[in-house]
Amino acid sequence: MPTLLAFLEYDGSAFFGSQIQKEEPSVALALQRGLKSMGIASKVRFSGRTDRGVHATRQAVSFEVPYKKSDWGYFKEELNKKLFPYLRVRRLYPIREGLDPRFEAKSRAYRYLLSEEPLSAFASRYVTHAHLGDERKIQEAMKLLVGWHDFALFKKSGSQEKSTLREMRRCWLYRYRSYWVFYFEANGFLRLQIRLLVGALLKVGRGEMSLEEFKEQLEAKRRFFCEGAPPYGLYLCKVSFESSIWEVRDRNH
């Protein structure tokens, strides 16, 4: 059967994370149930996990389907009807048989949305309300993040990782309408890494943590801060792959 790479978007506030939980709703379970209702029992393979409350606009998942290319448009439309309203397939691409996007992804990117203005009841699950502080100090701290670093002091306590070394390729802070947006792009991320980084950067902006202290924690010398920002403002927004994974160049809309 053809292996497809699906790019998903989902409302993380409706799920207890992307991975299957014992008794709680998850993105993977919702997708598996949607596929099963169409007679597809394929294993679903995610490019990476997102925790409870974290959203995605471009999560990558692979699975096999018993449909020929001419039927993929119909398949996507029918599947989205079953996934509505919290989960949606945006695009489908054919890839080489059996590939796992977790191991094939060359980079991932996240955005974190913050508002200094009071939020409406409808926005509180999608944006974090907090005081930013000094933008220039935060930008200086974010420049320190670019490159290879040992993020051992910016990960979830107790999480098991073969290596805590990651390459931060791009990161910056910018203004979008009434929001502040933190952008991070790396070859991979540790659990809670971005939320811990945002929490520390906000401490720097407010003058509660010096640039030198931030640098020491980044160099895994000493922990000054270990409280992560809330999950609600965090979005997985991009997963990139080498061109060699694609079976064909044409894409299905």
From Swiss-Prot:
tRNA processing among keywords: yes
Give the catalysed reaction(s), semicolon-separated. uridine(38/39/40) in tRNA = pseudouridine(38/39/40) in tRNA
Q: What processes does the entry annotate via GO biological process terms? A: tRNA pseudouridine synthesis
Which InterPro entries does the record associate with it? PsdUridine_synth_cat_dom_sf, PsdUridine_synth_TruA, PsdUridine_synth_TruA_a/b_dom, PsdUridine_synth_TruA_C, TruA/RsuA/RluB/E/F_N
Q: EC?
A: 5.4.99.12
Q: Which residues form the active site?
A: 51 (nucleophile)
Task: State the UniProt keywords alphabetically.
Answer: Isomerase, tRNA processing
Q: What class of enzyme is it?
A: isomerase
Q: Which GO terms describe its molecular function?
A: RNA binding; tRNA pseudouridine(38-40) synthase activity
Q: Tell me, what's a Pfam family for it?
A: PseudoU_synth_1
- Quote the record's binding site residues for substrate: 110
**Family stated for the protein in its record:** Belongs to the tRNA pseudouridine synthase TruA family.
Q: What does this protein do?
A: Formation of pseudouridine at positions 38, 39 and 40 in the anticodon stem and loop of transfer RNAs.
Q: How does this protein assemble?
A: Homodimer.
Q: Could you tell me what this protein is called?
A: tRNA pseudouridine synthase A
Report which gene this protein is encoded by.
truA
